A protein has these predicted regions:
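Structural core segment of the AMP-binding/adenylate-forming
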Residues: 1-10
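Conserved adenylate-forming
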Residues: 14-27, 32-76, 98
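Glycine- and other small-residue-rich loops at beta-strand/loop junctions that grip anionic moieties
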Residues: 21-24, 45, 78-79, 101-105, ...
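Alpha-helix N-cap/helix-start capping motif
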Residues: 29, 106, 128-129, 156, ...
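Conserved S/T- and glycine-rich ATP-binding loop of Class I adenylate-forming
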Residues: 29, 35-38, 74, 80, ...
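Conserved AMP-binding/adenylation subdomain of ANL enzymes
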Residues: 53-73, 83-123, 137
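Gly/Ser/Thr-rich phosphate-binding loop
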Residues: 98, 121-126, 135-197
Length: 197
């Protein structure tokens, strides 16, 4: 092959002859998502295409007046194997054309904050522990948060003291959600414009 394009053309033509289309329905299994094991051993939750797409549609209705399609810059600091991050950061924000900034090691606070300073992010998702970690950084507290539209807390309860410090530092409320792996994951979430309670 002279280049990658030639290889891809050959591969696509070969696949057209050898592969047949697979018919899927909304009730077909999309993935097995493992739970966090907070109440015992980790279990595989069966999630269908309909489960995941329903959650994405619910998210779309929830945030539609707060976002601009294709213009959001989202901080993805939670692991994508966690259902909260997988659904919200990857599936939803990718679906609407957002730019996801993947933080591969959020425990490396110095580099995490350095990355946050580099991008004018509009959304961040985190757990209480991560919000607290960021608030310990004097460099983080000096970031310009003018573009930050909302912060979503999930995966564990966000403490009121954390939410108050976050609001004071960023000018942005933490919007708390609740869910389970088995529900792919969102069950309920507060309104973005509401004060934390």
């Amino acid at each position: 092959f002279n280049n990658f394009r030639e290889f891809m053309i050959l591969w696509i033509n070969k696949c057209k002859n050898e592969l047949s289309e697979i018919k899927l329905s909304g009730d077909d299994v999309a993935l097995l998502q493992y739970t966090g094991g907070t109440t015992g051993k980790s279990k595989a939750a069966i999630l269908t295409h309909k489960n995941l797409l329903s959650n994405i549609n619910q998210l779309s209705l929830w945030v539609k007046s707060h976002i601009k399609i294709g213009e959001e810059v989202v901080i993805t600091a939670l692991p994508l194997y966690h259902i909260f991050s997988l659904t919200v950061n990857l599936l939803y924000f990718y679906y609407i054309g957002s730019r996801n900034i993947l933080i591969t090691n959020p425990r490396d606070l110095k580099n995490f904050v350095k990355t946050l300073k580099k991008y004018e992010f509009t959304v961040i998702t985190a757990v209480n522990t991560l919000f607290n970690l960021l608030l310990t950084s004097s460099v983080f507290r000096k970031i310009n948060f003018n573009k930050l539209k909302f912060s979503i807390g999930g995966g564990m309860a966000v403490l009121k003291s954390t939410a108050n410090k976050w609001k004071k530092t960023t000018g942005c409320e933490i919007t708390q959600g609740y869910g389970l792996t088995e529900t792919s994951p969102i069950v309920s979430v507060n309104k973005i414009e509401d004060k934390f309670n």
